[in-house]
Amino acid sequence: EYLNVDSSIQAGNQISIENAAGLTNNNLLEAGNTLDISANDIKNSQKGILQANTKVHLSANNQVENTGLINSNGLTLIETGQKIQNLGTGQIYGDHIALQTSQLLNAEQQTAEGTKSAVIAARERLDIAAQQIENREQALLSSENQLAIGGKLNQNHLAEGAAQSLDNASARIQSAGDMYLSVNTLTNRNLHFSSSEKEVPNSREQVIAYQGSGSNEILDASHVTGWGGQETVYLDGNRYEDYTKYDYTRYEKQDYVDSSAPAYIVSGGTLTLDGQNLSNNKSQILAAQGIKILQNDVDNIDAEGEHRVIQSGTSRYHYVGWNSTGTSKRSKWNGSKPYNPADIVTPKKLNVVKYDGSYQGANGGVNPTQIQRVQTEAVDDKTNSEIRTITPDLSLPNQSLFGINKNNNNEPLIETNRAFTQYKNWLGSDYMLNMLSTDPANMHKRLGDGYYEQKLINDQVAQLTGKVYLDGYTNY
């Protein structure tokens, strides 16, 4: 018989439930030591909490579906025969999280409060063993230390072997320490990239230019060194009586990024990639201590665009001929003609993809990789200076790791879920304000708590430098 848990159940030591049909939890199941549930199917609804101090173990022949909270202060172990679906408001926390399944889906879902993205976050280590893994639409796979993805869990609940596929689609996989991804096919891709052609700021200018008869060069007025009345011009020292005068507008257009939601794979330690087909499509792979490639290299796919120089105006041909009596020369102009030469087109990469670190290939050699930086503000391409500015993303996060405090002025607007932080405080701007004796009452509401503020800073460092840490730093 299918079991629905609609009332709170708490035990000081252990809760063990075994049900062949299945179980749906709509309330609180909490154990002081271990929580063990075994069933064909296990569903933890949005209001459901499965929690234990030492260990949470969920075992399902078919699938586990979670839109609520699954949390332990020790090991969170979930094993299924078919699927683990962590959706929308779904949160899975633990010091050590170990997942064993055939298919893992960590993704977004529409809720009454809008779109929410699921999170699986470990305080010490995250191990995922699956054949097919999909992390989608701002969903998060995270570890505050090590993270490993493979094909099966060993007796110590560590991932080993190889998964068949990992699709990280406009979502994030991150670890503060080392990361090991053993996946036959890894796809890190941007689901929401778009670009369009726009005029380059300050590129428009009016041009007067000349082309001597028989010459292939069109030279602007700065090359005119003298006039011989109205009959001749001197272009770079050459005298021309017959020439074409051009009067046109010159301007530039190029492709700019309109929208982008890159996928992120970010390691604060060494990132080891072990797979046959590795693709980084308009997204970012960053590792502070380098990237180690055990099989095939990563195919970094950038967005392609064009830069065009456009010229549009009129031309008139000037020539000198004899008068009707043949006794003197006269300057003559033909009528105006449209001047619209073919655009000068140059391919242009939009520098969306990032792949940072020196990587060690299968042959043991260490090769530098180019760091590509995103230039988010338009810059006049005619200058030699480099200007890189980043506007941080200050939109409210939809990841379920973060909550929004709309009405409580004593708390930051964005607060990390306390079940994950275990009610610990993270160093943030409030500490700095206290040290400076600044009265927060005279200031605006803080945007986020310390954990979220650190995330914003880390994201800006990555965007500005293409690196996980600033030079000279080895941690957050």
Language model region names:
Residues E1-Y476:
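Long, low-complexity, polar and repeat-rich extracellular regions
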